[in-house]
Structures are given as structure tokens and as C-alpha cells.
Amino acid sequence: MSDRPLPSSFDPYNSYLLRILLCSVLPVQFLAVHELITRPIPAGCLATSYALLRAYKSMKAGDSAQLNRMFRFRIYAQAFTLLAGVGGGFYYQAERAQRKELERAVADKKAQAKRDAWLRELEIRDQEDREWRERHEAVGKAAKEAGNKPKEANLDAPKVPTKESEEAKPTGGILDAVKSLGKEK
């Protein structure tokens, strides 16, 4: 068996354990029970409506004693509703403030996580941009070095002009190139 003692009706955590049990077993019903416990105003409204319905039925039946009892019950239910609203407002004021604080902290944490993710994405994009620029500069430097290198083959050999190389060498730019095209025909 477990090391914990059996629960007692005098145990201050009894209702807490009951709520935990209800929450784990029946979450939808737990929410209804929790709302009824923390906000008893709907229960007062239902009791008032029930009293009015019973008063109507008593009036139709002609039972004036039951009618008077139901009207008194309606007044008690309305008083309960008012007291529940005022008392619940005072009683749960600290809890509501604590819940708002918790919700604000969760929202701040969520916003901070979103901001951190955005900053990480910006850093990744910046790193990719830097890497691309470095590669682009490396390719540009390699192209410049390849363009500036003289051809190493036959540098020591004497240059002898040939007829083909003299004819193919344009001297006047585009106009000479067009004229040379006309000569080939």
C-alpha cells in the first residue's frame, strides 16, 4: 500500500484532491463544478427561475399556500444571487488579480519566445548573407586573378606574325569589323 495516510474529512487538501481527481477524470464536468463553486450566481439564477416556474404552476392549480412559499423562495434565491455576486467579488478578488498576473506573465513569456525566435532567424539570415558575400568575393577574386594571369605557354618563343592573325586583328573597332565582314564575301 502507499505511505500516505487515508484522506480525512478534516484534511484541508480534501477539496483540492477532489478537484484534481475531477479534473483528471472528467475535465468538462470539472469545469462546470469549478464554475459553480467559484461563481454561484448562475445557481442563484436557476433557483429563482425554478421558484417562479413552481409559483406559476401553483397559481394555475389554485394552491395559494404553495404559491406564497415559492414567492418567498424566489426572494431568498434572489438574495442569495446578490450576496454570491458581492461576496464572490470580494473573496475571489485576489485570485483574479493573481490569475491576471499569471496570464500576463505567460503572454510576456510567449512574446519573448516569439521575439527570440525572430532574432535567431535574423541571425541565421545574416550569417547566410555573410557567407554568400564571402563566397561572392572569393569567386570575384578568383576571376580577377585568372584574368590578370598571363598565359604561360610559349612566353619565351618569338612572336611571328602570320597573315591570318594580321587580318583578324581589328584596329578601328566596330566599323572595321563590319568592313572585314564585307571583304569575306
UniProtKB/Swiss-Prot annotation:
Homology family: Belongs to the RCF1 family.
Oligomeric form and interacting partners: Associates with the respiratory chain complex III/complex IV supercomplex.
GO CC field: mitochondrial membrane
Membrane disposition: Multi-pass membrane protein
This protein's UniProt keywords: Coiled coil, Membrane, Mitochondrion, Transmembrane, Transmembrane helix
HIG1 domain residues: 12-103
Segments forming a coiled coil: 92-117
One of the Pfam families matching this protein, by short name: HIG_1_N
GO BP term, example: mitochondrial respirasome assembly
Role of this protein: Cytochrome c oxidase subunit which plays a role in assembly of respiratory supercomplexes.
Matching PANTHER family: HIG1 DOMAIN FAMILY MEMBER 1A, HYPOXIA-INDUCBILE GENE 1 HIG1 -RELATED
The protein's name: Respiratory supercomplex factor 1, mitochondrial
UniProt keyword Acyltransferase present: no
Subcellular location: Mitochondrion membrane
TM regions (residue ranges): 16-33, 75-92
Chain intervals with Basic and acidic residues compositional bias: 128-154
Record lineage: Eukaryota, Fungi, Dikarya, Ascomycota, Pezizomycotina
